[in-house]
Amino acid sequence: MGANKQMNLGFLFQISGVHYGGWRYPSAQPHRATDIQYYAEIVRTAERGKLDFCFLADSIAAYEGSADQQDRSKDALMAAEPKRLLEPFTLLAALAMVTEHIGLVTTATTTYNEPYTMARLFASLDHITNGRAGWNVVTSANLAEAHNFGRDGHVEHGDRYARAEEFINVVFKLWDSIEDGAYLRDKLAGRYGLSEKIHFINHIGEHFKVRGPLNVPRPPQGHPVIVQAGSSHPGKELAARTAEVVFTAQQTLADGKAFYSDVKGRMAKYGRSSENLKVLPGVVVYVAETESEAKAKYETVSNLVPPDFGLFMLSDLLGEIDLKQFDIDGPLPEDLPEAKGSQSRREVIINLARRENLTIRQLYQRVSGASGHRSIWGTPKQIADQFEQWVYEEAADGFNILPPYLPESMNDFVNFVVPELQRRGIFRTEYEGSTLRDHLGLARPKNSVAKPS
């Protein structure tokens, strides 16, 4: 790896960890799911490790899947801890008060929200955090979300992304509708603002009609950092045009290199440099002094997932397929029905099963800890070797760390893996800037609405 090549590291914060068995792990603390001090302790640990950001994934439904699927699987659902039990904007605003440097990122869907509301929320969060906010832009494919917003089914794939593109464009205009320096607050002159620096955007499009301006000053970062996680063709196009960070699930180095090259190769037609997009594959890390001890941690937590829930979860990831009709200790059938949910994630999981000849039981044990992301175990050196190889061979610019069980696995990562990366000179030893854009090496966007001076 080149001497100046630094990797970026964030982490996904789900209550007791991303593994569905994580809440049952001996050191887990599921009783603290709504305790702000619990969240603060873990985020401060990540900040001690100089990580770029904390990511709170969000959904506007309690469970995944259709109403019928949920009704059939009530008991199975009760075997798993919910992925979230607090609304993320409120939680991140609280965490901003107990942290100084780490970025704070959350999800908001373009399918069941309005641009003005999202522009206002993220601009406010960016001010509260002093420039540390990020928006993970998603389009909703979860039927449970559709059912919470008066729909019998979700919006079709292509339509979701068309709406998302316009949605993001409107939000950008709204963030830029109040120029830097628009508010003079001149007490002597009796003039609070400059009308020439406050703009009505007057957007009229296929999906939205928005006059503006925003009633929040321009964010400290200009725009909060835009994150995107879709790996389908429309998702990669959206990322190439608008995203600054991409979360992705890639199981192999070859797949990672192909995705990296593909999504960055689409950017030039939008007038963007590939340096302005950070590709961060998700990875679940089990680290210990020996490889066998690390693997034992993986096996322990994997065996804590009840079969009924494992089948339900795998069924949802594969597109609501009834897996109970198949032998749990046999292979995944070749002729699976069409997917109803995320097509790219389904493909990752099917390829994993075929490549490693996994039974259905082995497959749900693998994905219950990662939802299609890569799981690795080993010593700090072995983990760092893999990280370094992926960045050196342009399969990643860094990683979105998925702690399997909390708080222990975050402590392990910060105490053992981070020092090894720092020793190699490929991860920072101190924060060098104050904003999330600074951490990621991203420039502050120019104002698209302001007239040239």
Curated annotation (Swiss-Prot):
Transmembrane segments: none annotated. Pfam families: Bac_luciferase (PF00296). CDD domains: Nitrilotriacetate_monoxgenase. Its EC number is 1.14.14.10. It catalyses: nitrilotriacetate + FMNH2 + O2 = aminodiacetate + FMN + glyoxylate + H2O. Keywords: Flavoprotein, FMN, Monooxygenase, Oxidoreductase. FMN binds at residues 58, 107, 157, 161, 231-232. GO terms for molecular function: nitrilotriacetate monooxygenase activity. It comes from the Bacteria. Belongs to the NtaA/SnaA/DszA monooxygenase family. Heterodimer of two subunits, A and B. This is Nitrilotriacetate monooxygenase component A. It comes from Aminobacter aminovorans.
